[in-house]
Structure formats: C-alpha cells, structure tokens
Amino acid sequence: MSVLDLNALNALPKVERILALAETNAQLEKLDAEGRVAWALENLPGNYVLSSSFGIQAAVSLHLVNQIRPDIPVILTDTGYLFPETYQFIDELTDKLKLNLKVYRAAESAAWQEARYGKLWEQGVEGIEKYNEINKVEPMNRALKELNAQTWFAGLRREQSGSRATLPVLAVQRGVFKVLPIIDWDNRTVYQYLQKHGLKYHPLWDQGYLSVGDTHTTRKWEPGMAEEETRFFGLKRECGLHEG
C-alpha cells in the first residue's frame, strides 16, 4: 500500500473516490487496529488528529491511538449540554491518558441559541439537524482547519448502527483522510480491550445507557430498542460529524 494523494482524491466524485480506495481498504481489513493506526501514520499525511465524544466506549480509541501517537490532538466538540458524568469522564481520561485535549464550541452559547432559535432538538428532524450543524459540524470543521489536519482518526464501529454498517476503514471526509481503526470490533472485543488495559466504560453505562450524547437527546436503553433508537428520539443516529 503506497502513499495516497489527498488532493487527487478530493478532486474525484464520491463514488470514484470510494473505488480508488477499495484496494487499500481490502488490505486494511486484514490488519488489526494497532496495525491500521501504524499504517496510517506511515502512509498518510499529517497533521494527525483524533476525535472523541467521550461516550460509552471512548477510552478504547483514546488509549489505542494515543499510545501509538502520544500527544496527538484530541478534538472534543462541546455542546454545553453533555451529562455531568461526561464532563467528569473527560477530566478523568484526560488525566489518566495524558491527552492533548482540544475543545471546540459553537460561536453562540447554548443560552443564546435557545433565545434565538428555541429548543432546536424539539423541532423535529430539521431542528435537530440545525442544532447539530451549529454545535457539532461547524466546530469540527473549524478544528480540522485550525489544526491543519490531513488525517483524522475516529472510534466508530459497524456494529453500532445501520448507518455505520458498511463504513470502510479508510475514507476521505471533509477534505481529509478519515481512519476508523476499530470499525470491525464487536462489543466483546471492546470489553476485552478495556479489561486488558485497566480502562472503564463511561459512568452512565452502569445505569443502562448504550450511547451517550446530550442530556436532551439521549435515552436509556429499554428492552426491544436498537442502540440507535436511544439517540435523537430515534429520528437520527448521526450527529452530523460522521455524515457526508
């Protein structure tokens, strides 16, 4: 697998870009998670960044990537509506793993947004998408630009939802390479990794949460629910960061 030309790939239509990466992805599927990170660091351009929502299994990708690339910038888009337990988890992991945390927020405060738009998350799919654009997508785009990122690591897994079921290890998104080292991991593999390295799930895991985002759009799991139904009232799975 050779070094890939980001500018050339960005110039291609999406379908052609996927086809251009197909052979590389076939090889990456054969590597383990650590091998994928190492390959990316050797073959893809820097600067390198890692994004995290500090959700249920966040400790896995944070530990995995940071141990191979210490001091990699870790991007958090903070909406201002995270659970108290999430903010505590962020502090705990930042200290334990010595993370180079970079926090990005919307230009407007949460209170100002509510005054201007009302509670967007109560305004159906259109409102949720506007909320996500303001609080997740724009801050992430700004982070990638300010950090001059060309390669972006993230901890998505195919098992998490239908929208992630066919994601490849390597793609181009928002003009940069995107690498998903643990994309093919199942819940058992996640658990084993956490146990092996003395890491914890998010504190709300023990209270019945399978996925954690903002307080107003996250539900506990109940029998019969798919994991993706615990977010955004079942109307959406993605917050916008991993779409497009």
Curated annotation (Swiss-Prot):
Pathway connected to this protein: Sulfur metabolism; hydrogen sulfide biosynthesis; sulfite from sulfate: step 3/3
Catalytic activity: [thioredoxin]-disulfide + sulfite + adenosine 3',5'-bisphosphate + 2 H(+) = [thioredoxin]-dithiol + 3'-phosphoadenylyl sulfate
Gene3D superfamilies cross-referenced by the UniProt entry: HUPs (3.40.50.620)
Keywords: Cytoplasm, Oxidoreductase
Active site: C239 (nucleophile)
EC number: 1.8.4.8
GO BP: any one term: sulfate assimilation, phosphoadenylyl sulfate reduction by phosphoadenylyl-sulfate reductase (thioredoxin)
Originating species: Klebsiella pneumoniae subsp. pneumoniae (strain ATCC 700721 / MGH 78578)
Main location, first listed in the record: cytoplasm
Enzyme class name: oxidoreductase
Name of the protein: Phosphoadenosine 5'-phosphosulfate reductase
InterPro entries: PAPS/APS_Rdtase, PAPS_reduct_dom, PAPS_reductase_CysH, Rossmann-like_a/b/a_fold
Gene expressing this chain: cysH
Family: Belongs to the PAPS reductase family. CysH subfamily.
One Gene Ontology molecular-function label: phosphoadenylyl-sulfate reductase (thioredoxin) activity
NCBIfam families recorded: cysH, PAPS_reductase, PRK02090.1
Cellular localization per UniProt: Cytoplasm
GO CC annotation: cytoplasm
Function: Catalyzes the formation of sulfite from phosphoadenosine 5'-phosphosulfate (PAPS) using thioredoxin as an electron donor.
